[in-house]
Amino acid sequence: MDKEARIISHFTHALNGDDGALLGDFVYSKDLFIENVHFKREWLSMQGIGAKAVLVNLSDAIAMNATPLYALLGLALPKELENDEIDALCAGILSTCAKHGVSIIGGDTTSADKIIISLTIISKANKKTLFRKKAKIGDFIAFTGSLGLSLKGLKILQNGGKIARNSRFIKPSLRIEFMKKSAKILTSAMDISDGLANDLPKFLGKKGAKISAKLSKNQWLSGEEYELLVAFSPKNKARVQGFAKQTRTKLTIIGQVKNGYLKIPKYRAFKHF
């Protein structure tokens, strides 16, 4: 058991283990966004840091087909930050929240030796809430968008290069419209944050899968993609593909859910610890 799994095992509860927790009519989700873990200050503008912190948090709610409404913000900042840097960071957070209809209703601030942003998103559950591990035997497995672009951008930055402000690493794409249209016929969903090689086993739970698509190493390993990983019945294949076309969302079917084991390439996948 790796350290992340060990930590999580101490806090098992019927409501956790998914992208968010469904409690009554609301879904609660949280992600941390930490300097030198998820980003370096020289890679993103302060406004870009604030914006991405919000986007990666909204991704969990969208994967569960919930509508984000409110946020609680925890903000720890180094004392050496200038006022204009603080203003830019807050502007990125606020403008991105406003764009997605989210109001910040509380939180806390403190000092730290690096930037730490913690958001708790409170979302309205829609008619059908989607969870991990609910795919049925025979269901197709697919992901939205293109995987590998976030890792490509990260490698460029690590080598001292520059990437476009709208690159996947800086600005993840949230598949809101696709989810709104397709949720009613999906059986399971989650967002891809730790790379497909890490997230597919979490998505399937105790089920296996036959992977028919030929994917590159970067597609398997690229984290912080925030694309959707979804499952749906073969009888709904044409409808899901139709919704993808209507919303201009690339959709790649990679295999089907099966009894037995999941066989994926043995790459060294990302670990938090």
What residues fall within each predicted segment?
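Helix-biased detector of long, well-ordered alpha-helical tracts
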Residues: M1-F273
